[in-house]
Amino acid sequence: SELPGIVAAYGQAARNAIAAGFDGVEIHGANGYLLEQFLQSRSNKRTDAYGGSIENRARLMLEATRAAVDAIGADRVGIRLSPYGRANDSGEDDPMPLYTYVIGELNKLGLAYLHLIEPRASGAGQREVDHQDVPSGCETVRPLWRGTLITSGNFRTDSA
């Protein structure tokens, strides 16, 4: 399996970023990229320890994030999530059970911040019609997340 090497690469990439003079790293668990593909039930059809249950689907994201934290410290690691994203065939019909679990586990790591893509924005900056009436990440996730929360995506004067 390639997964242990992928997890190790997150730690090495974090070390490389610090060595190159960056202040920290953001783990990209959004927009249909690898970590989100494992996380979301629409894209993850695995039947091993990385598929099926919420805990299993979250495993790769949590392992990769822990590898970065172990490499450079939690205060230098943030993570970006898109609970309502649909990029690359990812997504959840009801994302809150999954993200309640993921955010609870991420809280334990003491990360620098959590960066959310708003439900009303897609990866292409267009409105996600399916989620246009879902409250802001500030309303849905703030009660779950203990640290710094950043939200982005399709803000307008009436929603900012």
Predicted features, each with a name:
Residues 1-160:
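Flavin-dependent oxidoreductase catalytic cores
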